[in-house]
Amino acid sequence: MSEAASQDVLYEVADHVATITINRPDVQNTISGPMLDALTERLLEADRDSDVRAIIITGTGRFFCAGLDLRTGNPGGGTGTERRVSVTLDLRSTPPTVLHNLDTPTICALNGSAAGYGMDLALGCDIRLMADNAKLAAAFTARGIVPESGGTWILPRLIGWSKAAELIFTGRTLLADECERLGLVSRVVPADTIGDAARALALEIAGQAPLAVQSSKRMMRMGMNETFDDHVHHVFLQLLPLFQTEDFREGMASFMQKRKAEFKGR
């Protein structure tokens, strides 16, 4: 990761919560080629860190992310529009694909508006909290392209085919209250409390048994594409190793003793 990219994608871990911050407020937090690699590295780093139990993704300033920064040219070197677009497209899918496959729960704190790739990045997170002054826009068809980063897969599953088609085909901008009504975000909070709200939720998740939370996420992901009978079978297979963990014993003991559990993640 380059020094510039590390400044554009900030990373910190505290109290079992990793926070990844897109930090280019002067260009509406648009994402450059090197930042795509940095985002991927940070997401994988957090997921592999046994101390991290929840991940927050947010932005600095008035925007969460206004999309990709195509003005920076070809991140892979060389010249020519076709080569530049080809390399950019190769890089675009990486962070959303990583997000989709992470076991660690992810929270998007939409501190500001998200458009295009920024919207897809937000949709890739498990939970979305949204500032009351933020907006969402697909904004792909107006640029002559498609939502290449998972939006066409996620949106119909979140809000149904008809509404997803309307949003993708028109690129219409949504205000925060409509995003909440449609189920695109879990809740809308005052803009000046978005960071605190996301952290409070992350800490609440981090207080649960981490192996159980991760297994629950895997089961939810698998359940999107399998029958009920297959899913129940896979849930049973997840339960067997959980019964052998220290956290299971601690969870049972804390319940019987009417005290707060102290989970170790093992």
Locations of regions flagged by a protein language model:
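Acidic, divalent-metal-coordinating active-site segment for phosphoryl/phosphodiester hydrolysis
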Residues: R172-E178
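CoA-thioester-processing core
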Residues: T94-D103, C108-A109, A115-F169, L182, ...
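Conserved CoA-thioester-binding segment of acyl-CoA-metabolizing enzymes
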Residues: M1-T60
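Terminal low-complexity tails and localization/encapsulation signals of metabolic enzymes
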Residues: M1-Q7, A253-R266
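Glycine- (often His-adjacent) and acidic-residue-rich active-site loop
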Residues: D37, G59-V98, A114, A142-G144, ...
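C-terminal long alpha-helix characteristic of the crotonase
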Residues: P25, L129-A134, V185-E246, E262-R266
